[in-house]
Amino acid sequence: MAHKKAGGSTRNGRDSEAKRLGVKRFGGEAVLAGSIIVRQRGTKFHAGTNVGCGKDHTLFALKDGKVKFEVKGPSNRKFISIEAE
């Protein structure tokens, strides 16, 4: 008589939903006020001129213009600014 013992249960088999983080508007791209530029965890990018920072560190445009990425300061921080048109 052939018998197959039941397989044990596993504690795996879950995964969290992707959070869609990253740069949404790139350098030189035209944006309108309120447009999201970067979604991030922490301040990988810092807010420069005409850019606001949300409570989840999302960077967004405060004025219409073009996106500009720059590296500033002794610690080489990455800043994102909007050059108003």
From Swiss-Prot:
GO terms for molecular function: structural constituent of ribosome. Residues 1-20 are annotated as: Disordered. It comes from the Bacteria. Keywords: Ribonucleoprotein, Ribosomal protein. GO terms for cellular component: cytosolic large ribosomal subunit. Pfam families: Ribosomal_L27. GO terms for biological process: translation. Coiled coil: none annotated. Belongs to the bacterial ribosomal protein bL27 family. This is Large ribosomal subunit protein bL27. It comes from Serratia proteamaculans (strain 568).
